[in-house]
Amino acid sequence: KYPELKILLTFFSPSGYEIRKNYAGADYIFYLPVDTPSNVKRFLDIAHPELVIFVKYEFWINYLSELKRRGIRSYLVSAIFRRDSVFFRSYGSMWRKALDAFDQMFVQSEESRELLHRIGFDNVIVAGDTRFDRVAAIARAAKPVDIVARFKGDAPLFVAGSTWGPDEDILLPLINANPKVRFVIAPHEIEESRI
């Protein structure tokens, strides 16, 4: 869509690089220089990025600090945060400050969003696991669940996951209008009053 823009794909680990070193979706592919202040400045001076995307666990403090200082937009995608990680510890202020560099964070779970919200970050969107290849592999490896197979029988099956009340209000007419379809609704929060 934007042929004048170039995509630069970097890796820190040899395993990631080896898998994607010939990836056709990027214009340039190479190793990310080690996260030292001088390396970061030199790399950014050469690359002149307009936008930077970090994936999952990529929290390079010097890169993030310099990107913020230069006003270069940065995003974090497919991130997962856990209660016991350094960001949520009393000694994690340096790491929390690094998160300030992100214009937007796309996390995999509501739990991650909640944890970040508790320490003052509202620029967080729950987007799930954006790695299509991983999602497809999980789907291919899925084992049939006997109780679901028996429930489904020969009927079409509609599954709605992580639903909220407003979602279920929309689904109700669909359910009533399709008596030959089986529905599985997995609410985001299970409340006895809604069962």
Name what the model sees in each region.
Residues K1-P3, R140-I195:
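Conserved catalytic-core segment of nucleotide-activated headgroup transferases in glycan assembly
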